A protein has these predicted regions:
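Catalytic donor-sugar/metal-binding loop of nucleotide-sugar-dependent glycosyltransferases
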Residues: 290, 299-318
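Long helical/loop segments within the catalytic core of UDP-sugar-dependent glycosyltransferases
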Residues: 83, 87, 170-194, 206-292, ...
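N-terminal membrane-anchoring/stem segments of glycan-assembly enzymes
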Residues: 1-110, 162
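Short, acidic, metal-binding catalytic loop of nucleotide-sugar glycosyltransferases
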Residues: 134-144
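Cell-envelope/extracellular polymer assembly enzymes that use nucleotide-activated donors
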Residues: 114-117, 146, 282, 297
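A conserved acidic beta->alpha catalytic loop
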Residues: 151-158, 174-175
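A conserved hydrophobic helix/loop-capping motif in glycosyltransferases and polysaccharide synthases
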Residues: 117-125, 140, 215
């Protein structure tokens, strides 16, 4: 009888959740169902443990090892479901902020809206990548912005191309601090109210600044992160031939996990496709250089300084995903190493 009662207790909210239109409520109810199943399984599992029975050391070791593995899996699933149980959608807020920003511009000109410096960081990317990024950035629809190409490769051809394209070019005598050092060097030579970051293989959308700049009307916001959207399949999708039936790995993070973290108030900067308040960057002495994942460490520092990071689940650019397994795993290794450094 107990099983039937449990089944009905779980089936009812599941059926109701499938009928509800609000996805967050549906997701919360389904999460509650999974939590109930996890709790029931854990109670049963602990009941199978040979408490009080005489077992030799080897038997106890294997019992405890399997139980520990199961507990780790249950905790991991619980934390994941908790993270995605409620998702934010700031599209309406961005619409409202853009409308107010355009009204201010229409009534008082570009002095009434925040100026933006778009920084494109590059080291060894070729012209077939950089030309699209630079030309796309120069065509952004916003009255008060400047495009800066930060070249740590010190390439004369790139300097000439920037001059022809009408964008600014910056290099430096050394590459100290890698990407973070490159950005910090540029911050000293620029003066926009906001700083937008794009990797060399990302092309910004025409309306990218209108969609994000108005969100900084909230004086507590230090960073607005947007999705990293890709136009090509990553190396895994390409090699398995599943690009038409399976989304890229990053989409899972930016469509679900990032929105869930934002709802919990723990969104973080992912580097490219983010826009920052200059005042906030200055309060932190720029990007931290003591981690190879300077973006995540910046978020931690911003929290300590009282600045807020939010996530707008709306692509403002399109980029190039890792095309080979070597580059794919090198990138993930760097992220993992940086995460350990921050922790």
């Amino acid at each position: 009888m107990g099983f039937e009662v449990l089944f009905l207790a779980l089936a009812l909210p599941t059926a109701i959740s499938l009928l509800l239109k609000r996805s967050n409520i549906r997701r919360l109810l389904l999460t509650a169902v999974v939590f109930a199943f996890e709790g029931r399984y854990l109670a049963w599992r602990l009941g199978t443990f040979p408490w009080g029975n005489e077992q030799n050391g080897a038997e106890w070791f294997w019992w405890l090892l399997v139980l520990a593995i199961e507990l780790v899996v249950i905790i991991e699933v619980t934390l994941f479901l908790f993270t995605i149980s409620w998702l934010t959608d700031r599209t309406g807020l961005a619409d409202q902020a853009e409308r107010k920003l355009r009204e201010r511009y229409a009534s008082a000109g570009k002095s009434a809206i925040p100026s933006v410096d778009l920084l494109i960081t590059t080291y060894n990317e070729g012209p077939e990548v950089l030309e699209n990024s630079i030309l796309g950035a120069s065509e952004i629809d916003y009255p008060a912005f400047t495009v800066w190409v930060l070249d740590d490769g010190k390439r004369p051809w790139l300097k000439h191309f920037c001059e022809d394209a009408g964008v600014r070019y910056i290099t430096r005598p050394n590459n100290q601090g890698a990407k973070a050092g490159n950005i910090n060097h540029a911050l000293k030579q620029t003066k926009g109210d906001l700083v937008m970051l794009m990797d060399a293989d990302f092309v910004a959308y025409k309306n990218s600044m209108w969609r994000t700049a108005g969100l900084f009307e909230n004086k507590r916001i230090g960073t607005v992160q947007t999705p990293q959207n890709f136009f090509n399949p990553d190396a895994i999708q390409h090699n398995l031939g599943i690009s038409l039936s399976w989304c890229d790995e990053q989409s899972f993070f930016f469509r679900l996990i990032a929105r869930g973290r934002d709802a919990l108030g723990v969104a973080f900067c992912c580097g490219s496709c983010s826009i920052h308040r200059r005042e906030a960057l200055i309060s932190n002495n720029g990007f931290p250089t003591d981690s190879i994942t300077e973006d995540i460490l910046l978020t931690v520092n911003f929290c300590r300084l009282g600045w807020k990071t939010i996530y707008l689940a709306e692509p403002i650019s399109t980029g190039l995903a890792a095309e080979t397994l070597d580059s794919f795993f090198i990138q993930r290794k760097r992220w993992g190493r940086g995460g350990i450094q921050v922790a």
